[in-house]
Amino acid sequence: MENHIVYQHKLAIYPEPAQESGILTKDTLFWQHNGVKQQLNLNDVVGTSLVEQEDGIPPGLLIYAYPKVKVGLITKKQQRVLQQYYFTVPDVKLRSQWQQAINNTLVNQPLDADIKPRRLQIIINPTSGKKKASQIFEQVRSLFEQSNLEYSVTETHSAADTKNLVHNLILSDIDGLVIVGGDGTIHDAIAGLMSRPDYETAIKLPLGIIPGGTGNGLCKTLLEQSQESYAPINAAFLIVKGKQQSFDLATVKQNNREYHSFLSLSWGLISDVDIGSEKLKFLGALRFDLYALLLLSALRTYKGKFSFIPDPDFKPTHHRTTIQQGEWQVIEDDFIFLWAMNTPWAAHDMNVTPHAQLNDGAMDVLVMRKGTSRLELLQALLRCGKGQHLDLPHLEYYKVRAFRLEPLTDKGILVVDGEPVDYSAIEMRVIPDLAYVNC
C-alpha cells in the first residue's frame, strides 16, 4: 500500500459483519466486501455520523461522500452527488475511534487531536438575481448538516444591511463567512470587513461563495480553477472541504472616497449593458445578451483618458500598445468600452480575461476604441463566453498594477463590482493577497 496507514481496525459495509479490518490512509478508506477490496476517496468525503441500532439495523458509522457524477442528457457536466456508506461497527468505543480517525484525517490532523468544528456565518441575500438565493441554500443545506461544522444563517435585505452585519461580527465566534447571493453581496460583505477597526484581521476571514445572483463571476472562477462545474452544490462542497487561497483586492479612490473592489470596473458599452439591463433581471444572464444587441444598433463612443502602470511581466501583443515599464502610460481617445477584471470570469458564462489570476498582483484590462465595426464588436462579445476573443485585431489587452480612468464624455455609467458608482475620475490600485476564499 503506497500511503502510510493512519488507522486500522474491524470495519464492514452493511449488512456484512465486521470480521475484516478496514484501513485508513491519509486520502483513502479501504475495506472488504464479498472478498473484494473496496475503497473510498477521502477527497470526496465531507463528514460522518454515528448511528445507534434501529429497526433491526446494527449500530454503525455513516459516511457522507459527494463524488463527481455526470448529470444532464446533453451537457453531461460533472456534479457532486451524495453517496452514503454505512459501516457496521457494533462496539461503541470502536465506532467513536473510527469517526475521530476519519474526521481528523479529513482536516490533516493527528488522530488524537481534539478538533473543534469550524463555525460559519452564512449570509443569504434573498433579493439577489432571480430572488432565489434562499431556495438555493435550502438545496445545499444538507451538505452543511452532514459535515463536521457549525453554522448560523442570516438573511439580509439591503447593501447597508449586509455591511452592518459583517461590520459587527464577533470574529472570535466564527471561522469563515459564506455568501449566498451575487457579486454585489460579496462587495458589500468586503466593505463591511474593511470598515471594521480590526480590518487587517477581519479581511483574512475566509469567504465561501454559493452562487445566488445573476453574474457570479468570483464563484465561477473558484469552481473553474478547482475543476468543478458551475453548480451550487459544487460551490457548497468547496466551502465544506475548507481549502483556502489568498486573492487580491483593489483600493478604489474616487471623489475623496476610498473603498475596495474584488471583481471589476467597466465603462462604456459594458457598463451600459450591465446597468441598463437591470429591468430585465427576471431573465437572468440572458438579459445581458439581449440588451447588448439593442445597444449595438445605436453604438456610442466615450471620450476619456486611461492611465496605467503596467505589470512588470506584461508583454504587449497589440500593435497600438507601447510600454515603458514602471511609468504611468496614458491613452486619451474615444473608447467603445474599457473593462478591468481581477478574475478571469465576469459572470458564469463570460470568460472575459482568461489570463487573469486571483492572486497575481494585477488586473487585466480590455479596451476597444472608436473605429471598431459593429460586426467586430459583436464577434468579441460572442467569443468572450469561451475566452476566445483576445486575438481579435481591434481588442487591446493590458495587465496593470494600477490605473486611472477619467471620463471626458458628459453622460455615461461607471460600474464597480456590478454596481454603479459616481461618474467621475476613478483610480484603482491592486493590493496583493489581501483577502482569502474557499476554493
Q: PLM features: residue spans?
A:
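Catalytic core of tubulin tyrosine ligase-like
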Residues: 295-296, 342, 349, 433
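ATP/NTP phosphate-donor binding region
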Residues: 1-180, 187, 191
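Glycine-rich phosphate/pyrophosphate-binding beta-alpha loops
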Residues: 266, 270, 339-355, 420
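Catalytic core of DAGKc-family lipid kinases
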Residues: 156, 193-340
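Histidine- and/or cysteine-centered catalytic micro-motif in compact active-site loops
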Residues: 309-311, 340-345, 355, 368-372
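Active-site loop ensemble at the mouth of alpha/beta enzyme cores that anchors a bound cofactor
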Residues: 329, 352-360
